[in-house]
């Protein structure tokens, strides 16, 4: 007779132990505006890591690169090749944008698994990777949308909008809808993957010994890197598409 109440108590106990909080946020009031503090704090940490790493690695460049300098030169070459492949010969001005997107998302994703965010206690919610928040991923997707609109308009002028009625005006609604679905797919793909990965690891750590979730954490690091690469590749592809005018 007491099986159901005991089961409910057991499940409630496991939920309390897990400490998974979804939708809990900590806000700052600045100048009458409500600011999402969790995202700002973790984003500042990620930006500091990126800037600090670059400064340390290249503050004294050598003719024969050191390990740190060699690593960053390899990363730059990788981003340059990615941009050239997706955008074409006019890729040069877009390397900083694609590189910034890739590195910020990559370090943000990895920070969710490697940095002990829970050490910092907040009145509400808890810190996590910046890309674990839909606000961040939507902002990145909107920046990408603005970038490919700018790329198309700067090269073609107002004739850029002719693409909406090609190859036939009947496709006008579909072509317009496509520009709305691009940022949606970019933002929700990144947000969903990172959130799911962190929740799985947190739940496993709370329910089983520490050794068991380690393979899942390594898998999460791999998929996090892949998500950063996918986002940067799609951003570059959209920019290249807007400049070339093909689908």
Curated annotation (Swiss-Prot):
Q: Please give an example of a GO cellular component term from this record.
A: chloroplast thylakoid membrane
Compartments, as annotated in UniProt = Plastid, Chloroplast thylakoid membrane
- Name the cystine pairs: none
Q: Where are the transmembrane segments?
A: 38-58, 95-115, 134-154, 199-219, 220-240
Q: Topology relative to the membrane, per the entry?
A: Multi-pass membrane protein
Q: Which GO terms describe its molecular function?
A: proton-transporting ATP synthase activity, rotational mechanism
Pfam families for this protein: ATP-synt_A
Query: What keywords does the record list, in alphabetical order?
Result: ATP synthesis, CF(0), Chloroplast, Hydrogen ion transport, Ion transport, Membrane, Plastid, Thylakoid, Transmembrane, Transmembrane helix, Transport
InterPro entries the record matches: ATP_syn_F0_a_bact/chloroplast (IPR045082), ATP_synth_F0_asu (IPR000568), ATP_synth_F0_asu_AS (IPR023011), F0_ATP_A_sf (IPR035908)
Name the protein family.
Answer: Belongs to the ATPase A chain family.
PANTHER family with a match to the protein in the record: ATP SYNTHASE SUBUNIT A, CHLOROPLASTIC (PTHR42823:SF3)
What's the protein name? ATP synthase subunit a, chloroplastic
Per the UniProt record, the source organism is: Oryza sativa subsp. indica
